[in-house]
């Protein structure tokens, strides 16, 4: 009976948490902690406009300016302070991006940032004379007989002018094929043999006979003038 009484007293003294063997404080610690959720403020268009105007005036407003602005836009001063912190961080990021883009643009090694060079080959080629050693000595469009100092062949060796094809071409093409300037040293009318070989022989024999007659006449005159 004594044992039964002791067991009954012990059962009354026990608690529900002790039956499990773990204290209630440890059981609460084992439960996962809930993360603190931040309340995001949704700004109206009017509030954003006033905040941006204040940021343009000063990036670091003091407490009095923030309180005055908070009363104006109907927001807590803490929310206004957080907005200015976020706005300054955004402004710094923009400044860094602009500085990096300017450095890339000013780098001389990057050729793709340079403006393309315009080639003015046409006006330069028209204004500057060409090197005479690089040009051909005689242009194919210039006729040979128009070159100064050229001695033309006799007309007997040249084909008649009626046989040239450029005389039968249209006037527009014929003007383009004419020489650029008249030749200053063209030979005159070529020698044409008007007398055949027989006439030349007769003339030479007649000249010789005339010379003989002249000598005989001089000799007769000398004889007549000799003293008697």
Curated annotation (Swiss-Prot):
Family matches, as Gene3D superfamilies: Homeodomain-like
Segments of this protein annotated with the region Disordered: 1-41
Keywords in alphabetical order: Developmental protein, DNA-binding, Homeobox, Nucleus, Transcription, Transcription regulation
Motif (Nuclear localization signal): 211-215
Compositionally biased tracts (Basic and acidic residues): 1-18
InterPro entries: HD, Homeobox_CS, Homeodomain-like_sf, OAR_dom, RAX/RAX2
GO molecular function: DNA-binding transcription factor activity, RNA polymerase II-specific; RNA polymerase II cis-regulatory region sequence-specific DNA binding
GO CC terms of this entry: nucleus
Gene Ontology biological process terms in this record: positive regulation of transcription by RNA polymerase II; regulation of transcription by RNA polymerase II
Predominant place of localization: nucleus
DNA-binding region: 36-95
Keyword DNA-binding: yes
Superkingdom of origin organism: Eukaryota
Compartments where found: Nucleus
Residue ranges annotated as motif OAR: 205-218
Family of the protein in this entry: Belongs to the paired homeobox family. Bicoid subfamily.
Role summary: Plays a critical role in eye formation by regulating the initial specification of retinal cells and/or their subsequent proliferation.
Protein name per its UniProtKB record: Retinal homeobox protein Rx1
């Amino acid at each position: 009976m004594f044992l039964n009484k002791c067991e009954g007293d012990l059962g009354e003294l026990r608690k529900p948490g002790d039956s499990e063997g773990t204290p209630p404080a440890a059981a609460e610690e084992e439960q996962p902690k809930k993360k603190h959720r931040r309340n995001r403020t949704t700004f109206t268009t009017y509030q954003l406009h006033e905040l941006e105007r204040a940021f343009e005036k000063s990036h670091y407003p003091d407490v009095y300016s923030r309180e005055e602005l908070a009363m104006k836009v109907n927001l807590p001063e803490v929310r206004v302070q957080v907005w200015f912190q976020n706005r300054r961080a955004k402004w710094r990021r923009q400044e860094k991006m602009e500085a990096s883009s300017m450095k890339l643009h000013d780098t001389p090694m990057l050729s793709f940032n340079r403006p393309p060079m315009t080639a003015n080959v046409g006006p330069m080629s028209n204004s500057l004379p060409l090197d005479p050693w690089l040009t051909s000595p005689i242009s194919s469009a210039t006729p040979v007989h128009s070159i100064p100092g050229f001695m033309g062949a006799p007309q007997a060796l040249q084909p008649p002018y009626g046989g040239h094809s450029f005389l039968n071409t249209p006037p527009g093409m014929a003007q383009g094929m004419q020489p650029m300037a008249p030749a200053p040293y063209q030979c005159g009318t070529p020698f044409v043999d008007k007398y055949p070989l027989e006439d030349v022989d007769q003339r030479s024999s007649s000249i010789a006979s005339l010379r003989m007659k002249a000598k005989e006449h001089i000799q007769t005159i000398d004889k007549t003038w000799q003293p008697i």
